[in-house]
Amino acid sequence: MSNQVNSMNKGLTVKDLVTTGIFTALLFVFVLVGGVFFATNPVLTFFMPAGGGLLAGPIYLLLIAKVHKRWSLSIMGVIMGIIWFVTGMHWAFALGYMIMAIVADFVAGVGQYKSKELNSLSYILFSLGGTGSYIVFFVDPNGWAQTMLGNGTEQSYIDTMQATANTGILIAMFVAVIITSAISAFVGCKMLKKQFEKAGITA
């Protein structure tokens, strides 16, 4: 146990940073592919975070297995947030991923990045970061609309979103993210069993 704690507390090496960067790129692609179908439809866009969470679990968990040290997940989330922001997403979408990545890093760290259950919970929390923009949409729809119009979103798209939005959609969005990311984490644990055993990750 002491060796695991010491390993976790050691600073990130150049190799760790390179690995984190590579997996961040892969994770971004998988989240993008999973969510793009929903993002293009103003009615289904609320489920973009759920779609994004469906495919990326194995990549996320493999990153933890490769670099089971503090700050790797946080760095991944910050980089992803920056990419989302510069590609025209709402600032709250980017910020949501950044904040939840830090929270997810802390949760996985509680188990020294060796617990399948905590690592899976960490992924679920990270996936909830994608709801940031939609939370702002429900809290301040006019402000959200102005920001997105400035980012190039069409008025008709926003009008359809506002006509569709209700409390039921908000609740369904959170439930869907939790379900899809939990499934993705479960599949990831099954797929990466050998890698987890090598890294000393247990239930």
For the regions a protein language model found, what residue spans apply to each?
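Interfacial aromatic-anchored transmembrane helix boundaries in multi-pass membrane proteins
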Residues: 35-40, 44, 80-110
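Hydrophobic transmembrane alpha-helices
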Residues: 2-71, 75
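Membrane-embedded alpha-helical hairpins and interfacial helices in multi-pass inner-membrane proteins
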Residues: 45, 120-193
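Membrane-interfacial segments
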Residues: 34-42, 67, 71, 107, ...
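Aromatic-anchored segments of alpha-helical transmembrane domains
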Residues: 24-32, 79-87, 125-135
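Hydrophobic alpha-helical transmembrane segments
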Residues: 17-22, 50-51, 70-78, 94-95, ...
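Short helix-perturbing small/polar motifs within transmembrane alpha-helices
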Residues: 29, 97-135, 185
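Membrane topogenic helices and adjacent juxtamembrane segments
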Residues: 1-35, 148-157, 161-172, 197-203
